Amino acid sequence: MKQKYLTFLCFYLIFNIAIFSQIVNEGTLQIEPSTTVYFGDEYTNKSAATHNNDGDLYLNNNFINNGITTSVSGTTSFKSSVNAIQTISGTANTANFYNLEVDNTLMGVSITDSFGLFVENAVSLTAGDLRLVGEAQLIQVNNIPNSGSGKLLRDQQGVSTTTAYNFWSSPVNNSGTFSLNGGLFDGTDAIINSFTPQQVLFNSGSPYNGVPATVVGGNVTTPLTISTQWLYTNPAASGWNSINQSTGLAPGEGYIMKGTGAANQNFVFKGTPNNGNYSFTIASAQSLLIGNPYPSALDSWQFITDNLGVFDQIEFWVDGGSPSHYTADYLGGYAIRNLTTGVAPSVISSIDGLGGASGTIPERHIAVGQSFIVEATGAGTSIVFNNAQRTFITEGSGASVFYKNSSSKITKEVNSFIRIGYEDPEGFHRQLALGFLPNSPADMKYNRGYDAIMSGPREDELFYIIENDLTKKYVIQGVGAFEDAVEFPLGLIIEEEGVHTIMLDAVENFDKNVYLKDVVLDTIYNLSTANFIPNLPTGEYLDRFKLVFKPKEEMLVVDDVVLEKTINVYYNKNNSIIINKPSELKLNNVLIFNMLGQQLVKVTANLLSESQISIPFQFKKGMYLVLIESEEGKKTYKIVN
């Protein structure tokens, strides 16, 4: 049979019309207001074409958009009783409607993976379901309730092990709230049974583990099972609260849940798509588990900006391979995101994909189904989600992350960033981020929303010190445009003896060397070429180290102006360091360091009145630094043995 085509080059439809042939728009298709059009067969909007529907368009088949779609009024209705599944797809990867109606009496409308469906106004699921496949997303603009008996279905995956927590929030509701029993479905066979997933099962007994689905011939015969032992919410005033599968959760309310033990586990959320404004009340110093309430990505920058009077950073739990249900065995930490950038959590660096520069840095956009912790640090008490915070960004792009075991991609930003790493003797890797943001209000002072405080500090830590406030440990510092003369103070706390390492994790849009300055030794180390391993006794070093970008004429320089009185320091043939000084000059300490900044000798006795001090020194041949501290100041000398 010969296929029929109808091609529009430039066509304005202003009367009621029904067309039953394959339709291709190669120019401009304008459907005027108060005009009703029926397309019986598949409709393609080609790459150079523009589709404008301000009337009522009824589609009995698929819609393929390779071009531009616009709409300021009207309704696009996918209406069919003969085509079980109608699809929306195309190389444009997006489509724009004013109102969307699904009126398919068989199954519904399927949105292809990684496709963004933008709806200015209402979504009416009159009959049939709207299936967002994979990373497809629905983005709405107006604050208007969605309606209809049909449901939206959306996939999401998490950490699949039975001992690891995922932090979830639902993009859908059923009669205003979401419960797992009725809203969460088994997506194991979603590729085959996209519209008909089975409700997940639940257990509550020992050994308190979830169970993967039973699959025969690619089809789920027994759905996956979730252990209710590990279901919790964290309301602001209550701390962690145990819930069950029937607990109703408000849109945007977060919950945590452990996995099934499957190699990969896909879940399907099913319900009315969330849309519009949602709010939560919180008091000062309270923490709250909330999450992305929408079936689209959430722009964390806009979300934080809108709520900056309440909180100034958000925290994402990242599991690091917890081996059991015992709290003491939990591995992982909280990644942090603010208006400057994000940093990975402090976890053991040997854990694959975690703890490094490319592991689990939170990107700007929060994935569908992802929840997070906020803490009220401002005077405000109301946290608001709204449609202006929604955006279309897929996880596959690397700009949106849902926290599971695999590492995320890193996307380039227009600002410049430096990521400093610190590893303690136990192998925990802490990352600090410094952002140069020339078009922001951030400066060298504390800037709310741009500077982030460390979450869950350990005994051994490296952190930024801002405005000489020693009560706070910062992991993110945002400033203005880059200036090579500016220095950034660092705090280092050493509680455990062993190897402590400071390193350069990564730079983004930055082509200068990064140096660590030891103020005590007046020494500079190039972190761009090698790690720095201090050999220091336990203690707090809050005024010794700085991050700098301007090297001196030599990497190691002696300060010759602090002490006015003459001191002579040299190494003699008897394997001793000799210090000749005026007898009236009283010394407090003599410290000897190698060229890595490691302290080798400390002398405090017999320094008061002697004019000559002899210090036994039997170390391998090389150059060393002798730091002399007195009542008049301090001075560093170089010696060669």
Can you describe what each PLM-predicted range is?
Residues 3, 11, 79-81, 595:
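Generic beta-structure capping elements
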Residues 23-381, 387-388, 395-397:
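N-terminal exported-region signature
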Residues 18, 83, 112, 562-564:
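Residue-level signal for pocket-adjacent positions within structured domains
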Residues 234-250, 256-610, 617-621, 630, ...:
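Compositionally biased Ser/Thr/Gly- and acidic/asparagine-rich
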Residues 1-26, 557-559, 636:
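Bacterial Sec-dependent N-terminal signal peptides
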Residues 12-15, 19, 82, 101, ...:
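Prokaryotic Sec-type signal peptides and long signal-anchor helices
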